[in-house]
Amino acid sequence: MINRRGKIKMETVYIAGGCLWGVQHFFDTVPGVQMTEAGRANGTTSSLDGPYDGYAECVKVVYDEKDTSISELMAHLFEIIDPYSLNKQGVDVGKKYRTGLYSTDPRHLEEARAFINGREDRDKIMLEVLPLTNYVRSAEEHQHHLERHPEDCSYCHIPDAVLNLSLIHI
């Protein structure tokens, strides 16, 4: 989108794909992605403290829509998740590890749903596509964690070949 001053406006979506460390690291390497931030989507509070509030671990992805699209971001997401798994990616189990795409822009949600509906396996896919109702930035220790602590890659659900390739590109 172009804003009123004729400058390119970046688009923002929130992508959940299990543990956010690997998801953030992977999306940092995707062409067209300008910035990522680890966070929590659609919980009921604005706090990082206290009991679990229904959030999904997610990565805020800011991208240039002339360089990539929601469909392309979804295709990349499907490279690193098991789309048939509900509330589980790799060894990480629980509702906070569910997969999803969240946005405040209905166009993003429509394109994500169209991507899923265009797949032959659409009836088996457990990824949720919902409006973003709340976002909380994760603590600094979780921001770009694998870049600072590559020894933690062994905890990640993303296949080694994919994760190692993204390590090379950083």
Model-derived regions: residue spans:
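Flexible coil/turn and secondary-structure edge motifs
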Residues: 2-168
